[in-house]
């Protein structure tokens, strides 16, 4: 089954061209199926690019998915027009009465700030608490993952001496995990962050388990043993050119930045990078969506009573 998104969303045509099955609202109504309700809390400045990245992965599932785009109410986006936000987004205040089968919280370029100094931290805490009663399963990504694991488990973040930046080998630590079904023993994942969480702090919580890790970059994916929260600290959703875009953005702005590790062919920025993580990104999100489908209540309004 395809993903249901507005026909006029910029990602629509791109997804069609890529072979992702997308569905208009008219066609969705004709199918007698309850679509999985997936919310995307998009905290990134370039919301359109992030919409496409996440819709691409969620939409690859054989299940019908309805994606709702959500933003922080009082926060003004720097790189996305107000017209786009008004046309396609709802604020969390506008959707907090709803129940969601799945909910994605993205990263945000604010990781060097203490959590309490983030202007929308109080609302973020409300949203995280709300997910416990209104969301069946949550996928937290990069800063969203760090914020969530700090909020729920007190796991701190640490500033790195230099940006973790590139494509790194990671190990599958639990092949029997439902979320890692079909994963290789080791694989590559894009990394782009200024902070990290550490294994020792994760291990202090009996309810957390590390599923993916890199000998160079540390913890990558964590899940809750008795819950339905995933914490992805890196960027499996990235496009082939995402790291390149970040690199040249900083170079052109005169910001000191090292070339992304293990990314450009022959370490030559003039050569187009190859995507070596796409299949595992689809596996992770596909496994997540499938697990939601297997465990979520048939009546979406019963979410929160099933824990």
From Swiss-Prot:
Catalysed conversion reaction: L-homoserine + acetyl-CoA = O-acetyl-L-homoserine + CoA
Biological or metabolic pathway of the protein: Amino-acid biosynthesis; L-methionine biosynthesis via de novo pathway; O-acetyl-L-homoserine from L-homoserine: step 1/1
Pfam family, one: HTS
Keyword Cytoplasm among UniProt keywords: yes
Enzyme Commission number(s) from the entry: 2.3.1.31
Keywords: Acyltransferase, Amino-acid biosynthesis, Cytoplasm, Methionine biosynthesis, Transferase
Site feature (Important for substrate specificity) residues: 192
SUPFAM superfamilies in the record: Class I glutamine amidotransferase-like (SSF52317)
InterPro entries, per database record: Class_I_gatase-like, HST_MetA, MetA_family
One GO term of the biological process aspect: L-methionine biosynthetic process from homoserine via O-succinyl-L-homoserine and cystathionine
GO molecular function: homoserine O-acetyltransferase activity; homoserine O-succinyltransferase activity
Active-site residues, as the UniProt record annotates them: 142, 235, 237
Family from the record: Belongs to the MetA family.
Protein function: Transfers an acetyl group from acetyl-CoA to L-homoserine, forming acetyl-L-homoserine.
Protein name in the entry: Homoserine O-acetyltransferase
Annotated gene: metAA
